Regions:
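Intrinsically disordered, low-complexity regions enriched in serine/threonine
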Residues: 2-162
Length: 162
């Protein structure tokens, strides 16, 4: 089937935000009038961008206290690596790579966590104590799943702290 997901890409950035289930995902099976369904789906996805911008603006206006930033980062690490061993710390994935991500707001924390999780390259330790670098995510499926999960985590944090 053909699938369209709304997303938000920062300028000069390769970590595209795939919004969670709450913001219009469109699937078109390969049967019937596929072309018409794809066109309708494209209009539906385009209509979602105003809601995405509203969420982004709300996240930018919410200053996150350090414990909330740590909780968001810990949830992301647990989602990605599980409970057993996490090769990096919350401080590692909360360290911004870009000047514009040094803010104290939810959006900056979300963008920083997302970029660090997707790009990898963060120094850490294996379960046996050996020095390692986290791996970048290259799989489309893993990328989409992680992006969705991070969006839902950020959205949940936004709703609970408003």
């Amino acid at each position: 089937s053909y699938q369209m997901l709304p997303g938000y890409f920062r300028f000069v950035c390769q970590n595209g935000c795939v919004c969670g289930q709450s913001l219009g995902e469109v699937r078109v099976p390969h049967r019937g009038d596929v072309v018409e369904k794809v066109i309708e789906g494209a209009y539906e996805v385009v209509g979602v961008f105003d809601r995405i911008e509203e969420k982004r603006d709300a996240m930018q206006s919410l200053v996150l206290p350090p414990p909330a930033r740590q909780a968001l980062a810990q949830a992301a690490l647990t989602y990605r690596y599980g409970d057993e061993h996490q090769p990096v710390t919350t401080a590692d994935i909360l360290t911004p790579r870009r000047r514009e991500d040094y803010g104290k707001d939810l959006w900056s924390a979300y963008q920083t966590i997302q970029e660090n999780m997707l790009k990898g390259g963060i120094s850490g330790r294996s379960a046996k104590g050996k020095r390692i670098h986290t791996r970048a995510i290259h799989s489309i499926d893993t990328d989409i799943k992680l992006n969705r999960a991070l969006w839902v985590m950020a959205e949940t944090m936004l709703e609970s702290l408003r």
